[in-house]
Amino acid sequence: MQPTENSMQIQKEFIAAASHELKAPLAVILASAECISGDTNLSSEAKQHTAIIDSECMRMSKLVQDLLLLSSVDANTWPLKKTNIDVDTLLINTYEKYEPICRQKGILFELSTSDELFPVLNADIDRLDQILSIFIDNAINYSFPKSEISLDATVGKNMLVFTIKDHGTGIADKDKPFIFDRFFCADKSRTQKEHYGLGLCITKELVEMHRGKIELSDTVGGGCTFKVFFPL
């Protein structure tokens, strides 16, 4: 093994071990914060602080889950649980989950469906839901009020293609080659404290596990368009 490869392997093993060790204390802190917040005698200031603790613990818990997921992918210990998926149902469920969130933020979320029935997609439904969720979450986070986000699916040559399009801040050309790298954070206009640069990396890993691919392009008028290809 080359020195660089050895260093990367050591880093991956450390992240995996550290992530496992963080789960228990995080759970204890979160449980303690919930107990404290249930005290009816708490002052408004104390309630505010416990709410912050709860929020930050949940954020850290999400990071730990993402790190563990990537560690499992690295170790090839996370097999896909493929089933036959009804694409129409998946699209409708995804729309119903995110439309209220978009509406609350003043964003129009549109779902385009085909009049023709989609072929059955053989994939891991939980991972597919996670892939779409990451893209839509990103689209919401980087979209402006009164803008639009759209989700649709089409059938190409032996491929099912999901398209997520937003009219938000977009991604600079200089950042595009790196957006799927671990811990990469783009320019300040696309940097938020809730994100650690793992979401798109996770989508890439999960899509490639399905032998698919992702394409990124600019939305006409500004924003991003992601196309996710799954083999049929």
For each predicted feature, which ranges?
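Short conserved segment of the HATPase_c
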Residues: 171-183
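Short alpha-helical segment of the dimerization/phosphotransfer core of two-component systems
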Residues: 55-60
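A conserved beta-strand-to-alpha-helix junction within the catalytic ATP-binding
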Residues: 81-99
